[in-house]
């Protein structure tokens, strides 16, 4: 009788196979996990706008103003590394449209400047300095172009995509492709000096750009924008995420019709979406100084080490990453104040977390 009972109890165990474990909800990709481990990185703003002492270039600056006599990529990268930064993103083109590499897409580029007699490539120098120092390297290329006469037409979109192709193919593996949500407004536009408005829900055709270019040419690059696809903007430029921060996010705004950079559910960007459909953690961006570009009148107004550490705890400590804006002077160097603060911040991070 006991044998029969044992057999009867054994039959279900033999017949019923355990179900394989199923993932719960949205999950991170390998590229996103690599980004998460970066924790703190920097965003370098350095264009003719620096020499104009502005925050937003209009697109009409003479390339001749761009001449950083003592530019030293190693100094900038070294200071960033001493601050505990593990990567740098270079603004290769800001809204003013000036390209820091010798592009074939527009004459408004570094080859028309007197720097290195027009033979320089600032993107190359920063990229090589990052590789040498062991830092990751990424690219920011503004979709809005206040210099280009064709901005707002289909022809400009082809120009922008060709700029991305050049950047993706010339400067090695990128850890981020950074896309700003600012687009459309007044500008030089080849001399028109007018205001132009575009429908950002359709004009850039981001799905095509990111799928056909970024994913194919730079598969390891995390796409950053208001909506991701990989990393989302936190919704402020103060350097912190909400106390409750979900890596999952539903980016479509309440007003619809779809989410694109510049048209996103910013009300929940800082917190994210509990049980959200997409894994899109937040980047918390903030400049070391009051502005993203260098302004001599802001010397002495840099964030303190204690302020930076508090931002670290409110960004990285909440499951996001911290993107710290660095602004070289017109000499092409980080100011000594910035270098000192970065070094002290890096030491504070080391001393605080040296014991696990």
What are these regions (language model features)?
Residues 8-17:
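Hydrophobic h-region of N-terminal signal peptides that target proteins for export
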Residues 16-356:
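Mature catalytic domains of secreted/periplasmic carbohydrate-active enzymes
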Residues 1-9:
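Sec-dependent signal peptide recognition
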């Amino acid at each position: 009788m006991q044998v029969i009972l044992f057999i009867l109890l054994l039959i279900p165990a033999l017949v019923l196979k355990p179900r394989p474990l199923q993932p719960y909800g949205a999950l991170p990709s390998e590229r996103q996990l690599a980004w998460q481990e970066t924790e703190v990185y920097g965003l370098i703003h350095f264009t003719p706008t620096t020499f104009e002492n502005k925050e937003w270039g209009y697109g009409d600056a003479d390339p001749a103003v761009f001449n950083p006599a003592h530019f030293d990529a190693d100094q900038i990268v070294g200071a960033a590394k001493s601050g505990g930064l593990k990567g740098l993103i270079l603004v290769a083109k800001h809204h003013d449209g000036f390209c820091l590499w010798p592009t074939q897409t527009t004459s408004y580029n570094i080859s028309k400047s007197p720097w290195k007699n027009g033979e320089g490539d600032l993107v190359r120098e920063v990229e090589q300095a990052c590789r040498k120092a062991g830092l990751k390297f990424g690219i920011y290329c503004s979709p809005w172009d206040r210099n280009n006469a064709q901005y707002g037409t289909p022809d400009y979109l082809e120009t922008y995509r060709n700029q991305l192709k050049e950047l993706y193919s010339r400067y090695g593996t990128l850890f981020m492709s950074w896309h700003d949500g600012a687009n459309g407004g007044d500008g030089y536009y080849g001399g028109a000096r007018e205001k132009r408005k575009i429908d950002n829900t359709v004009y850039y055709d981001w799905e095509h750009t990111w799928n056909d270019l970024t994913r194919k040419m730079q598969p390891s690059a995390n796409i950053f924008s208001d909506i991701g696809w990989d990393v989302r903007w936190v919704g402020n430029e103060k350097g912190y995420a909400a106390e409750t921060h979900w890596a999952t996010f539903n980016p479509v705004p309440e007003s619809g019709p779809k989410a694109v950079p510049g048209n996103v559910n910013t009300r929940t960007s800082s917190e994210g979406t509990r049980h959200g459909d997409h894994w899109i953690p937040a980047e918390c961006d903030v400049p070391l100084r009051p502005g993203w570009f260098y302004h001599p009148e802001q010397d002495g107004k840099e964030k303190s080490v204690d302020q930076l550490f508090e931002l670290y705890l409110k960004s990285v400590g909440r499951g996001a990453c911290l993107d710290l804006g660095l602004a070289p002077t017109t000499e092409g160097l980080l100011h000594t104040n910035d270098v000192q603060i970065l070094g002290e911040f890096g030491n504070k991070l080391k001393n605080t977390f040296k014991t696990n």
